[in-house]
Design a protein with these regions (language model features):
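Histidine-/acidic-rich catalytic cores in large beta-rich domains
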Residues: 3-452
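C-terminal outer-membrane/trafficking sorting elements
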Residues: 36-37, 630-678
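Coil residues (strongly favoring Ser/Thr
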Residues: 71, 102, 132, 141, ...
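Residue-level detector of functionally pivotal "anchor" positions at catalytic/ligand-binding pockets or at interdomain
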Residues: 448-457, 476-484, 528-532, 578-588, ...
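Terminal processing/anchoring signals of secreted or surface-associated proteins
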Residues: 460, 467, 496, 515, ...
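Short, disulfide-bonded extracellular cysteine-rich repeat modules
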Residues: 466-476, 514-522, 565-571, 616-622
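Short beta-strand edge segments in extracellular beta-sheet folds
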Residues: 475, 522-526, 573-577, 624-630, ...
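Solvent-exposed segments in extracellular or luminal domains encompassing
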Residues: 488, 497-514, 539, 548-565, ...
Length: 678
């Protein structure tokens, strides 16, 4: 049996390829396919309409797609007119039309986080209105001067629950022209980079003047990218505006209304460059690289290169100014927007060229999935090496699959875009993915293997028996030892267990990586410190213990915190000693040099001095001094009381003496302290 030479289907699937499911459709077919990395069909949707261009698999498993409806007014590549959502059984659960004599949906759309849908559409601008806005007149081959109609771009945001347009933007509101100062939108083009030159990229023959072919939304910035291949630029717009602000040049978070916030690809479009500055040539699929991917936040473009004759995938890093309301840095009034150079680019001038349609996607491992639409080819390159690691030719001509060995005719299997999803994508939860057969007829025998990255070590706790490629993700049980010294009454939490007594404990926990983690814990208890202290203080003094102040006698208990964090119980006993005082009476004869408590006294009167007694408290000594010329004991006896005896300081009876203190004790109980000095 002679096998056909391979012409379609899967050509290669290397281990370096990112495993997943690839969504695509052929523009000549009403079917949309989901295939695995071996090219085997795992799901299929059927519609009554060919796609205008793009299709999207939503997070709930429904398919959002553009629809190609009949139009009697408009005819250009990417015409649509309809949008529909198909459930997993291909039932139409929602549809919407932008298809009239003056408007038409085309090419692309974008679903927003709130469920609303951004729709790319054109609106017909009459030649008369274009003339009032500064559009140039044109001369045909016969010499006839004429004006031309225009197709201008607009974006409609539709709520699919109500079918209401809740926001819109019109390119025609943001024009600039420098041909006639008496007409609308006159100005210096280079001074208005936020506006669209009405006379750029238009020769009067093709009214599809802007031909936007893709739209993307960045929820973090609340900004929109639309792509104009005829201008060789993509434009970024502010979506935070109201519809009224979107028609103006003020408003929104950026403060610039609906004017272009940033543009890149060919600064000739706003008179700030020349042919050497042009990078893009009829490019497609300008979009932000999503969060979580290696080049998140950068912008990826399929640069068709229809002038140079080869295509490239380009990535740029836009000069976003987060400190200036998410506007973009423009150095001065004469230079174009940066960057000056591409961040990254891939091309293969021999094997890779699509002069129209097409797109690209960065995958989770950094690889790039490329849909070379005109070739009907979907392939994947390894990001770091540019090596082709997956290669597939769409086996369709128009609406029908073709047999292996049949070469698709030029443009017979064109594809607008392809997208690969991780096997864990939420949209698959509502789909039954059943590998069936490849799409092509009479397929060749295949030994294709699905390469699944994961842990291939059976000893690891995240061992994946389906994994065929060890991706160094294996994780193993962790043994952890820890020791704690805690205070009485405190505790240690290990997993769901709480320990508050001394000892050794073993716990098995489940880590975030899916492995068991064995924890050995030793706990020691530090009891509270007990401290006893006693103080004898004087009346009026105080003792500070922690934050408390004590100035009365008694027993007190305080709980303090030590430097190790544990409690210290302090018992304090306080004795309050009274301050003392004494009163002396003294009679001396004149001319005696007398010192009393260090103080010279020689004049009759009262004296006082504060001393420190034996317990350290104040002792106030008072002296009444009398200077007399009489010697001896005065008034020992009187009619009111009788002297009983005289004692010294030791209580011993003593005869009358001079120059020593004596105590005179009377029968009425009174005692006088006297000293006669001569």
């Amino acid at each position: 049996m002679t096998l056909a030479q391979q012409t379609v289907g899967l050509f290669s699937n290397l281990p370096e390829s990112y495993n997943g499911y690839t969504l695509f459709n052929s523009l000549g077919s009403t079917n949309t396919y989901l295939i695995d990395n071996c090219g085997v069909k795992v799901y299929e949707w059927n519609s009554n309409f060919k796609p205008a261009a793009s299709v999207y698999l939503l997070e709930n498993g429904n398919l959002l797609k553009t629809s190609q409806l009949d139009s009697t007014t408009f005819s250009f590549g990417g015409t649509g007119g309809g949008i529909e959502i198909l459930d997993p059984n291909s039932n139409v659960i929602w549809s919407y039309e932008v298809n009239s004599d003056s408007t038409l949906a085309h090419h692309d759309l974008e679903i927003l986080p709130n469920g609303n849908i951004l729709i790319l559409a054109i609106e017909l601008i009459s030649a008369q209105e274009a003339d009032t806005c500064g559009s140039l007149s044109y001369t045909d081959s016969s010499g006839t001067v004429f004006s031309a109609d225009r197709y201008s771009e607009m974006i409609l945001e539709v709520n699919p629950t109500t079918d209401q347009i809740v926001w819109e933007w019109h390119a025609w509101d943001h024009l600039i022209q420098d041909t006639d100062s008496n007409l609308l939108y006159y100005g210096t083009i280079s001074e208005h980079p936020g506006r669209i030159n009405i006379n750029y990229a238009f020769d009067g023959t093709d009214p599809d003047w802007l031909h936007a072919n893709s739209i993307d939304y960045n929820a973090d910035l609340d900004q929109i990218i639309i792509n104009s291949p005829t201008f060789n630029e993509f434009w970024i717009l502010d979506h935070s505006t109201t519809t009224a602000e979107a028609a103006d040049s003020i408003g929104g978070f950026s403060g610039n209304g609906g004017d272009i916030l940033y543009r890149w690809g060919d600064p000739q479009a706003y008179n700030r460059g020349d042919t050497l500055d042009q990078v893009f040539e009829f490019q497609h699929d300008a979009h932000w690289i999503p969060s979580g991917l290696p080049d998140q936040g950068k912008i990826m473009i399929f640069n068709n290169g229809n002038q140079r004759g080869y295509s490239s995938i380009d990535i740029i890093e836009p000069p976003l100014d987060t400190n200036n309301s998410n506007n973009y840095i423009l150095t001065n009034n004469s230079t174009p927007y940066g960057p000056l150079n591409l961040y990254w680019s891939y091309s293969d001038s021999i094997n890779f060229y699509s002069p129209f349609i097409s797109g690209a996607q960065q995958l989770e491992n950094g690889n790039i999935l490329i849909c070379s639409g005109a070739q009907g080819k979907i392939f994947e390159i390894e990001y770091q090496t540019d090596s082709v690691v997956w290669d597939y030719i769409i086996p369709m001509v128009g609406p029908n699959p073709i047999a292996q060995g049949t070469t698709p005719p030029p443009m017979g299997n064109i594809c607008f875009r392809a997208h690969r999803f991780s096997p864990s994508y939420s949209g698959f939860n509502n789909l039954v993915l059943t590998p069936s057969t490849v799409i092509e007829l009479n397929p060749l025998p295949s030994n294709c293997q699905i390469y699944i990255s994961g842990c291939t070590d059976s000893l690891a706790c995240n061992y994946d028996p389906l994994a065929t490629i060890n991706d160094s993700s294996c994780v193993y049980p962790v043994i952890w030892q820890q020791a704690f010294v805690i205070c009485t009454g405190d505790s240690v939490v290990v997993g769901s267990n709480t320990y508050n007594t001394a000892g050794n404990y073993t716990d098995t926990l489940n880590a975030v990586n899916g492995c068991d983690s064995i924890i050995y814990t030793n706990i020691s208890i530090t009891p509270p410190a007990i401290w006893q202290q006693s103080y004898s203080i004087c009346d009026g003094d105080s003792i500070v213990v922690g934050s408390n102040v004590y100035n009365t006698a008694g027993n007190y208990t305080d709980t303090l915190t030590l430097s190790n964090g544990c409690d210290s119980i302090v018992y304090t006993n306080i004795v309050v000693d009274d301050n003392t005082s004494s009163y002396d009476t003294l009679s001396i004869i004149p001319n005696i040099n007398l010192y009393w408590n260090g103080i010279p006294v020689s004049v009759s009167g009262d004296y006082s001095v504060t001393l420190i007694n034996s317990v350290g408290c104040d002792s106030i000594a008072n002296l009444n001094l009398t200077i007399t010329n009489t010697t001896g004991i005065l008034n020992i006896n009187n009619t009111e009381r009788t002297l009983v005896k005289i004692t010294n300081m030791l209580g011993q009876e003593t005869p009358y003496r001079k120059n020593i203190p004596l105590f005179y004790i009377y029968d009425d109980g009174t005692v006088e302290k006297r000293m006669v000095i001569e």
